[in-house]
Swiss-Prot record:
The presence of a 'disulfide through disulfide knot' structurally defines this protein as a knottin. SUPFAM superfamilies: omega toxin-like. It comes from Hoffmannihadrurus gertschi (Scorpion). One of its GO terms (cellular component) is extracellular region. This is Hadrucalcin.
Amino acid sequence: MKTSSLTIIFIAVIITIICLNIHDIEAREIEFNAGRVVRSEKDCIKHLQRCRENKDCCSKKCSRRGTNPEKRCR
C-alpha cells in the first residue's frame, strides 16, 4: 500500500513539474514575440510599414494603395 501511494505521489509530482516547464517555455515565447513587435515598430521601413488606427506611421502620411483596403505609409 505504501509503495503504490509513493508511486502515485511521485508520478503526480513529475507531471506537475512537466506542466510548469511547458508553461514557462510558452511564457518565454510570448515575451520574445512581444519584444520583436516592439523592435519592429521602432525600426520601421517607411514604404513597408502599415498604417494602424490611432498610431503614427513612419512617414506620417497614410493613404490607400491599390485595391487592398489596407493602408500603407508613403
